[in-house]
UniProtKB/Swiss-Prot annotation:
A family per Pfam: tRNA-synt_1d
Reactions mediated catalytically: tRNA(Arg) + L-arginine + ATP = L-arginyl-tRNA(Arg) + AMP + diphosphate
GO BP of this protein: arginyl-tRNA aminoacylation
Keywords annotated in UniProt: Aminoacyl-tRNA synthetase, ATP-binding, Cytoplasm, Ligase, Nucleotide-binding, Protein biosynthesis
SUPFAM superfamilies the UniProt entry points to: Anticodon-binding domain of a subclass of class I aminoacyl-tRNA synthetases, Arginyl-tRNA synthetase (ArgRS), N-terminal 'additional' domain, Nucleotidylyl transferase
NCBIfam families: argS
GO cellular component entries: cytoplasm
Subunit structure and binding partners: Monomer.
Name of the protein: Arginine--tRNA ligase
Organism: Legionella pneumophila (strain Corby)
InterPro entries attached to this UniProt entry: aa-tRNA-synth_I_CS (IPR001412), Arg-tRNA-ligase (IPR001278), Arg-tRNA-synth_N (IPR005148), Arg-tRNA-synth_N_sf (IPR036695), ArgRS_core (IPR035684), DALR_anticod-bd (IPR008909), Rossmann-like_a/b/a_fold (IPR014729), tRNAsynth_Ia_anticodon-bd (IPR009080)
Gene (UniProt): argS
């Protein structure tokens, strides 16, 4: 219905321009909003206020002129001017009720649009280092990315979901040496675990697997491991220097193949666990992209060479630098260190070169908020490589903070003291976790209230929405139990009987669903859908409590059941996009 109003206003503008009452070269975006108060109609526009300055006329005068030339339309009952020049539209009941017929006809397809026009979009998200289980902070990025992908698909985009596996960096070496040291401990060596090693129980479990499969072939005396190494942090040394030294010692003692054995076993075990965890969370990736593959297929060299060819690099103190400041970054960035090793930034350059090389029209990176420093450098690299910077969106997601018993739970992967995503799912369920994670804007801090997530009350939004769906299903079951009839055709022919305020409100709400999807997609804000579904559920509960739904008057009863089924379908469609189930009973 909003599209009808926008069309009528556009025609009114053309009429005024053709009559010479308005400049012909106006470039005005027509915005139509849902009326917040039913007394002000169904839709409202501030078009007259927007036109006031360029037309040099009072908003109210412009509103009167617009209303006078708006074409008549059978769906519009009346148009009123309010306040300083707002134009309010009141729709006929017949126009509102047409949406019910559309929903019942389209079913699961209702709300899907063509905003994206099949543009290819790559969304990269989660991409947590495969050095331990996913924690509750990662869960928010997972839920947000998956839901955004669903929203964009519903809006007509061709979406690919990708996880970037950081399998070639220093953190993986730290995990590998952590596993090896626990392996030595199982062999009876009196190891002292490094301050900067990974300490979780999963490290012991991987070490146990290595011990069971490999026996003692990789055992070396502890004295040979730590001989002549610098001091660790507890002894007054630097933990970063110490862990790098012990990695180098492990590589020397085990050899390339031996160290790779621990590296690959740890990587596979942790990555398989991450995949299983996300699968159980309803988050499914189309692609798992290996950082190591960038080295193996020459992408790192290609990305660096592309910057060289464009004159965006220089050498200083034996290192190769990217002229990032030429593109707005605060400082230039190292691509290749003086020792010949490429940096993480070089991998980022190559990865984004690869993304565009695969033909995506739009790239969306979803990072944790702690990666805010990466945003500018990634965008400068994309621009320097000759790609359209506006085709790259970087969305920062604040980590969720979990509270239990009023106390904040601290999380650190290396210390091993963290609450995993799996533990959260087991405690509150997938549905609550998926909804709570996307109920706020991604940049907003989130305090995850476990008690609220588990409560069966109207204060718990996901329970409230699911209960609305279950209530409708219950009404349909009662229909059969009471031997009453629902003639859908009769209901559709008598939708004009739906005149109660609760009914017109519900009809207006379900009519908004396609607009919510398009808006959420355009702004990359899935929380709009979460808010909307709660509003729709509230409308349904109010209706359920105020009206006798299974009334004796057959025509009215059938019309109301058509409305109920439409609401149920919209709830079902919206919950599916959020990754939340729609139970038929609760």
């Amino acid at each position: 219905m909003k599209a009808i109003i926008e069309y009528l206003l556009k025609q009114a503008l053309i009429n005024l321009q053709q009559s010479g009452e308005m400049p012909i070269d106006l470039e005005i975006e027509i915005k139509v909003e849902n009326a917040k108060d039913p007394a002000h109609g169904d839709y409202a526009t501030n078009l007259a206020l927007v036109l006031a300055k360029p037309c040099r006329q009072a908003p109210k005068v412009l509103a009167e002129r617009l209303v006078a030339v708006i074409p008549s339309d059978p769906s519009v009952e009346k148009i009123e001017i309010a306040g300083a020049g707002f134009i309010n539209f009141f729709m006929r009941n017949t126009a509102r009720s047409l949406i019910i017929s559309e929903i019942l006809n389209k079913g699961k397809e209702f709300g899907r649009g063509n905003l994206g026009q099949s543009q290819k979009v790559l969304i990269e998200f989660v991409s947590a280092n495969p050095t331990g289980p996913l924690h509750v902070g990662h869960g928010r990025g997972a839920a947000f990315g998956a839901t955004l992908g669903n929203v964009l698909k519903a809006a007509g985009y061709d979406v690919t979901l990708e996880y970037y596996v950081n399998d070639a960096g220093r953190q993986m070496n730290i995990l590998a040496v952590s596993v090896w040291l626990r392996y030595l401990e199982l062999a009876g060596e009196p190891i002292v675990f490094p301050a900067n090693g990974y300490k979780g129980q999963y490290v012991y479990e991987i070490a146990q697997e290595m011990w069971s499969e490999q026996g003692n072939q990789f055992v070396h005396p502890w004295i040979s491991v730590v001989e002549n190494l610098p001091a660790d942090e507890p002894e007054g040394g630097d933990k970063e220097t110490y862990i790098d030294a012990i990695i180098a010692r492990a590589q020397s003692l085990l050899g390339k193949d031996g160290f790779a054995n621990f590296h690959q076993h740890a990587l596979k075990t942790v990555l398989d666990d991450i995949k299983d965890d996300l699968q159980a969370f309803g988050v499914r990736f189309d692609s798992w992209f290996s950082e190591q593959s960038l080295f193996e297929d020459g992408s790192i060299e290609k990305g660096i060479q592309a910057l060289k060819d464009r004159g965006h690099t220089y050498e200083r103190e034996g290192a190769l630098w990217f002229r990032a400041t030429d593109f707005g970054d605060e400082k230039d960035r190292v691509l290749v260190r003086a020792n010949g090793q490429t940096t993480y930034f070089a991998s980022d350059v190559a990865y984004h070169w690869n993304k565009y090389d695969r033909g995506f029209d739009r790239v969306i990176d979803i990072f944790g908020a702690d990666h805010h420093g990466y945003v500018t450098r990634i965008k400068t690299a994309v621009k320097a490589l000759g790609h359209d910077e506006s085709a790259l969106d970087v969305i920062l997601v604040q980590f969720a903070i979990l509270y239990r018993g009023g106390d904040r739970v601290q999380m650190s992967t290396r210390s091993g003291s963290f609450v995993t995503l799996r533990e959260l799912r087991e405690e509150v369920g997938n549905d609550a976790a998926r909804y709570f994670y996307v109920a706020r804007k991604p940049e907003q801090h989130m305090d995850f209230d476990l008690d609220l997530a588990k409560s069966e009350s109207s204060d718990n939004p996901v329970y409230y929405i699911q209960y609305a769906h279950a209530r409708i299903c219950s009404v349909l079951r009662q229909l059969k139990e009471r031997g009453l009839k629902w003639d859908k055709d009769m209901g559709l022919k008598n939708l004009d009987l739906l005149e109660q305020q609760h009914e017109t409100t519900l009809i207006s709400l379900i009519a908004r669903y396609p607009e919510v999807i398009q808006s959420a997609a355009a702004s990359c804000e899935p929380h709009q859908l979460a808010y909307y579904l709660r509003e729709l559920a509230n409308g349904l509960h109010s209706y359920y409590n105020a009206i006798q739904l299974l009334c004796e008057q057959e025509q009215l009863r059938c019309a109301r059941l058509c409305l109920l089924e439409s609401v149920r379908q919209v709830l079902n469609n919206g919950l599916a996009i959020l990754g939340v189930s729609a139970p038929e009973s609760m």
